[in-house]
Every structure is written in structure tokens, then in C-alpha cells.
């Protein structure tokens, strides 16, 4: 499977017990939603490899998983801290104005005055709204290295064009 078709949705953590269970860190909105997206791929030595989920459960407010063929602590330790990915085709279509974070990362952000503010390097979730983390251009006229711009569709974010990878915002370049 080619890497550009895989989206990271979580990470395996440390081992749990002696029978091959691992802790898991989900980056989906609801932690257990990670199990809605199958099959999983693990990034092992830079390559995505398919893996089958055998079982999962909550243990002391953490999620632990059992992967098929991982039957002891030693086998599980090899997979500790490995990223979990899924093929992008398993994600449902979104409504107008809704976007997956992976679609926004890498977009160029331009304000209404036409000033290129930088490139979206990551997204952050806050209590009220998502935030674009924008790495400023190296010769930013305002001396900025990074900008945090709220992803408030229509209020701040005026247009998203995924074809040209451009996000137009109503945001002062000095902020």
C-alpha cells in the first residue's frame, strides 16, 4: 500500500501483560472510533503493513488491543510506539464546509488582502473549535514563525480549495 493513501489514526503504546496486549493512543475524536476504521496498517521500518485486530477493551481508562499473531510480551514490545494507519477510502464523505484534518495539512493559507501567511503544518483541537497551526514563510514580513488561526468556517475561514490546496482566511497577517 502506498504511503500517500494511508492516514495515521493512532499509535500503539507500551505492552500490557504477557499475552501480547498493547496500550493504544487514538487520535480519532472519540477514542474508540479508531475501531470503526478497518483494516489497520502499522508503519514498521518505514513501510505500512496490514495487521488484523483480534480484540480490544478498556482497562483503567486506557484502551488495550490484541493483534492477531502477537501472542507474547516480546512480540508486542517490537510494536510499541508504532503508528496505526488506515486507508483513506474507509473515511465517510463529509458535508459541505466539513474537512478532514489530513486534507487541510499542507494547504497554503492566504488572507483576504492576498498575503501568503504560510502552510498548515498541523491542526489543534480546543474546547470550542479547531485551530490551524500555520508555519510562516521564512521571510515573513511580520517576523512571525507560526500563526494559530481558528478554523471557524465563514467567520474566519472564507474558502477552502482542496484542488489548489489553498485556504483563504479573514485574518490580520500581524497576528
UniProtKB/Swiss-Prot annotation:
Superkingdom per UniProt: Bacteria
One BP term from GO: ribosomal small subunit biogenesis
Cellular location(s): Cytoplasm
GO-annotated molecular function: ribosome binding
Keywords: Chaperone, Cytoplasm, Ribosome biogenesis, rRNA processing
Disulfide bonds: none
Domain commentary: The PRC barrel domain binds ribosomal protein uS19.
PANTHER family, sorted: RIBOSOME MATURATION FACTOR RIMM
Task of the protein: An accessory protein needed during the final step in the assembly of 30S ribosomal subunit, possibly for assembly of the head region. Essential for efficient processing of 16S rRNA. May be needed both before and after RbfA during the maturation of 16S rRNA. It has affinity for free ribosomal 30S subunits but not for 70S ribosomes.
Name of this protein: Ribosome maturation factor RimM
Amino acid at each position: 500500500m502506498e504511503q500517500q493513501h494511508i492516514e495515521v489514526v493512532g499509535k500503539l503504546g507500551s505492552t500490557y501483560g504477557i499475552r501480547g496486549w498493547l496500550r493504544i493512543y487514538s487520535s480519532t475524536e472519540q477514542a474508540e472510533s479508531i475501531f470503526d476504521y478497518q483494516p489497520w496498517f502499522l508503519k514498521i521500518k518505514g513501510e505500512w503493513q496490514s495487521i488484523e485486530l483480534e480484540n480490544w477493551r478498556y482497562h483503567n481508562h486506557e484502551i488495550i488491543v490484541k493483534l492477531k499473531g502477537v501472542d507474547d510480551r516480546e512480540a508486542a514490545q517490537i510494536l510499541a510506539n508504532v503508528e496505526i494507519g488506515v486507508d483513506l477510502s474507509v473515511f465517510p464523505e463529509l458535508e459541505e464546509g466539513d474537512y478532514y484534518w489530513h486534507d487541510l495539512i499542507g494547504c497554503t493559507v492566504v488572507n483576504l488582502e492576498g498575503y501568503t501567511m504560510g502552510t498548515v503544518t498541523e491542526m489543534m483541537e480546543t474546547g470550542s473549535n479547531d485551530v490551524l497551526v500555520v508555519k510562516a514563510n521564512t521571510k515573513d514580513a511580520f517576523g512571525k514563525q507560526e500563526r494559530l488561526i481558528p478554523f471557524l468556517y465563514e467567520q474566519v475561514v472564507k474558502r477552502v480549495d482542496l484542488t489548489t490546496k489553498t485556504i483563504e482566511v479573514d485574518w490580520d497577517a500581524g497576528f
